[in-house]
A protein has these predicted regions:
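A glycine- and charged-residue-rich anion-binding loop/surface
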Residues: 10-25, 29-35, 42, 58-870
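Cysteine-rich micro-motifs
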Residues: 48-62
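N-terminal alpha-helical interaction blocks
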Residues: 2-12
């Protein structure tokens, strides 16, 4: 299939040639607009007054609204309140925002546009919309244009997309192109008092999330105020097809609207007034308003995705008659403050919604922008406390997103990430010094490798070597690399086979049943209905028998359950078969699965609401749950989680299981029900243990008392931002506890002490061992020096074998001895390695090592060898 960029190029030409077919031409004409073709870019556009150019900043004179009051001046949140008030008369329903972490949308880490809230299920028609016509104030994250943030006024990593969405289904038409464009023009012209003569409508194409359609962009004075997309088509491997649900997807950035209405030089001062006041005060930066006003007008041409920012700077400098170096000196420190304001707010919302900085998934982007903040602070030597910046965001932005006022975890996250950043800085200097002279650092591929391997940002390089010109396309390239790959299904071809009815979802206690054979692929049997649980959601498959033939596995492929027989037997299509499920295995898997839910709930109670599930496994031996957390668990936290989990078990919480429409589940319980990731289907199964509610298709106990006992057996930080907890349940948990007690008893008996005295006794033995080890080391070093001194009295090389297993100790002995024997050679041999150093003009120590070692590295003066020859 074509990429988004390729498809957009193809469709842009097609839609322009057939504009009357794809755009609401007649309605636009009735509103007084006429069509023109831009003499510079060639696009079609509509205006109430005759124009030669389309109003794009690159086709005109940049942003011409700065310093002017073009329309009614509005506040940040007021922009959305007025949208709701205007669209209320047409029956639009305002929605509560979705989390910016898009766990419901496979292949996406974050919400990048408001329409993502309804993809893939609503837009594809699989699931009904929350209402036929809705509005939203959705926080979005985008990381492909980080270099532009702080420079253009329109670029943010985190921003509010005010959305107008209409869902036309085959059963019900609501509004589409004609009504949609009229409604938005009324919002701009009547509500916001934007003169109609100042409004320009662009014809364009929108592509995203596998969907596309014509769109109309609303421009005024060089600024795109909104984009109304008419999603009609879905891309397929064969081309494209018309969607069953046709959608209006309009997005307008709240940040852009409030900036445009104010006429201020930069949007960030209007969006973050309290944060910027603090940043200016702490850094004592006073921007030159005359220079900034001129720069801001032409900053519209800056776009790191399309061209080099360095080149754009030179172009702007020429336009406004200022030396490019002087312009950068004036602009960049303030732009750094704007970036810090933007990045910290984006981080705040993302962490609050359940993502953490890390080296994996969406966490990669969060670490990226946080480290950029650290680097900018260091580069310009700013006196900025990021915790105070976050507190101001919570106060300021919390007036709109009130749930942010409860956020506390982010302060811990910043502290830990700062420590990791400082470790990176200490390693960076040496690496950069080696590469600076070669010119490699101007290459974007080199920058990407440095960041991925060592966590080194371009800002950190610039801080250490200001004279080096760096590529401005680093962050856009990094975002391309880190986009999640689409999954491709493999396995057995089940096309044409009807999906299996999953009986266990409603009758999980049924252990024997009859079913019809509807297909057989080698040893894999497909039934019309099954109560065997296939491997999915981290839970192992059931075992048992079909017609007395033991099962080897049970798997599901594209909704079809495949029962793998342990031996070959041919069945007739339509044949009735008797099935028996292994009760004991199912019971153990069931209590393990429920225990994993309970432990997940306990981690949220103990560690905080930032915890999300990042994976799980449920077997008959033990369970595993991976949680999103920014550091390894302390022993006290580990024990507290176990305690809280067992309190829930003891409490006897009844499990609530029901299958309900997806929209109803999301509305009632929120988007955190997707702890196990995206769940397909119009209806989803909800499992609730008290306040812990998840969309889950697994088997579960009826009451937490059925679990009996949960024993946490280990926790480890398996990757950045993810902690794995292993657990055992029921009788197996008791067996594990007894095994641990047996080991403790054996140790106590061995030392002839009580259980309570074991820790102190172990500590005493450890201290004695350390003391003995130190004495042995001192004796070995002393003996080695005597042997070397004695040998070198009569010979030019001291070749000595020592009982040493520590390579660094061997090197230390040889190097210190060589300082005293300046015309001699020393070759020391340890357990399976050797080290030599030569101050003798005729002794090649590397050759000497080759005589006794299989592998040697170094030169004739100093070398080390490995794998002693036998």
């Amino acid at each position: 299939m074509a990429t988004d960029k390729e498809l957009k190029k193809i469709k842009r030409h097609e839609f322009k040639e057939n504009f009357a077919k794809f755009y609401p031409v007649e309605v636009i004409k009735k509103m007084g607009f006429d069509r023109y073709i831009c003499k510079k870019c060639g696009r079609g556009f509509w205006s109430t007054k005759k124009r030669e150019f389309c109003g794009e900043p690159t086709c005109g004179d940049g942003y011409t609204f700065i310093g002017k009051k073009i329309m009614r001046e509005i506040g940040y949140k007021e922009s959305y309140d007025l949208l709701v008030k205007t669209f209320k008369k047409w029956g639009y329903k305002p929605l509560k925002r979705y989390p910016v972490v898009s766990r419901w949308y496979e292949g996406h880490n974050f919400v990048e546009a408001g329409i993502n809230d309804f993809q893939p299920f609503v837009v594809s028609g699989q699931v009904p919309p929350p209402a036929p016509a809705v509005l939203e104030d959705q926080f979005c994250l985008r990381f492909n244009d980080i270099e532009n943030v702080g420079l253009t006024g329109r670029h943010y990593t985190g921003f509010i997309m005010m959305g107008q969405h209409v869902f036309n289904t085959p059963e019900k038409y609501v509004y589409f192109k004609d009504e949609g464009v009229q409604q938005l023009v009324e919002y701009f012209v009547k509500t916001l008092k934007l003169p109609k003569d100042d409004l320009i409508l662009h014809e364009d194409v929108w592509v995203g999330g596998g969907n596309f359609g014509p769109c109309i962009e609303f421009f005024s004075h060089g600024m795109e105020l909104g984009n109304q997309v008419y999603i009609q088509y879905e891309q397929t491997p064969e081309g494209y097809r018309e969607l069953q649900t046709r959608v209006i997807d309009m997005g307008t950035g709240a940040e852009r609207l409030v900036w445009f209405s104010s006429g201020e030089i930069m949007s960030y001062d209007v969006v973050f007034p309290e944060v910027m006041k603090y940043l200016y005060k702490q850094t004592k930066i006073k921007k030159n308003k005359e220079v900034w006003k001129k720069f801001a007008q032409y900053s519209a041409i800056i776009d790191a995705e399309e061209e080099d920012v360095n080149k754009a700077f030179k172009e702007i400098a020429t336009k406004i008659g200022i030396d490019a170096v002087e312009l950068r000196r004036e602009i960049l420190p303030t732009a750094a403050l704007y970036s810090i304001a933007d990045h910290t707010r984006a981080l705040l919302v993302a962490v609050h919604d359940g993502e953490l900085p890390s080296n994996v998934g969406g966490g990669y982007n969060l670490r990226n922008i946080l480290r950029r903040c650290f680097s900018l602070i260091d580069m310009y030597q700013f006196n900025i406390d990021l915790n105070e910046v976050i507190r101001l965001h919570i106060k300021e932005f919390g007036r709109w997103y009130k749930d942010l006022k409860e956020e506390t975890v982010i302060f811990d996250v910043i502290k830990i990430e700062k420590e990791r950043y400082l470790e990176t800085v200490s390693k960076t200097k040496q690496i950069i010094e080696k590469m600076a002279s070669s010119g490699e650092l101007s290459n974007v591929e080199t920058l990407l490798k440095l960041y991925e391997s060592n966590g080194i940002t371009p800002e950190l390089i610039k801080q250490l070597r200001p004279e080096i010109e760096l590529s401005s396309k680093f962050y856009s390239k990094l975002e391309d690399l880190k986009r999640p790959a689409q999954k491709h299904e493999g396995g057995i071809n089940v096309s044409g086979i009807q999906k299996t009815i999953l009986g266990f979802r409603e009758e999980s206690n049924k252990m024997s049943f009859k079913a019809k054979v509807i297909a057989q692929i080698e040893n894999f049997l497909v039934l019309d209905k099954t109560y065997f649980y296939p491997k999915m959601g981290g839970q192992d498959w059931d075992l048992g028998k079909i017609e007395d033939i033991p099962l080897k596995s049970v798997q599901m492929q594209d909704g079809v359950v495949l029962h793998e027989l342990s031996k070959s037997k041919k069945f007739e299509l339509g044949q009735d078969v008797s099935c028996e499920i292994d009760k004991e295995r199912r019971k153990q898997l069931t209590i393990t699965h429920s225990a994993v839910h309970i432990v997940g709930a306990a981690t949220r109670k103990v560690l905080g609401t930032h915890i999300n599930q990042a994976g799980s496994e449920k077997t008959i031996d033990k369970g595993k749950i991976d949680i999103t957390h920014y550091k390894a668990l302390t022993f006290e936290e580990f024990q507290q989680i176990e305690k809280v989990a067992n309190q829930m078990v003891k409490k006897g919480i009844e499990a609530e299981s029901k299958i309900i429409p997806r929209g109803e589940a999301e509305k009632k319980y929120g988007m955190r029900i997707y702890q196990g990731g995206a769940v397909p289907g119009k209806d989803i199964r909800i499992i609730a243990f008290g306040n812990d509610v998840q969309a889950c298709g697994g088997t579960h106990v009826e009451n937490t008392k059925d679990i009996k006992f949960i024993k946490l057996i280990s926790s480890e930080r398996v990757k950045d931002g993810v902690v794995r907890i292993e657990l055992m349940v029921g009788d197996k948990a008791l067996e594990k506890a007894q095994e641990n007690e047996k080991i403790l008893k054996q140790v106590a008996d061995l030392w002839n002490v009580s259980y309570k005295e074991v820790p102190k006794t172990a500590e005493r033995f450890f201290e004695e061992w350390k003391d003995q080890r130190k004495k042995v080391k001192e004796l070995t070093e002393g003996l080695a020096r005597e042997l070397i001194d004695t040998k070198l009295k009569t010979e030019n090389i001291a070749h000595i074998k020592l009982p040493v297993s520590d390579f660094s100790m061997l090197i230390k002995i040889a190097d210190e001895a060589a300082k005293e024997h300046k015309e001699k050679a020393i070759l020391l041999v340890g357990e399976n390695f050797a080290y030599g150093i030569s101050n003798h003009s005729e002794i090649d120590i590397k050759k000497e090592l080759h005589k006794i070692c299989e592998k040697v590295e170094g030169d004739e003066k100093k070398a080390r060898g490995f794998q002693l020859k036998k």
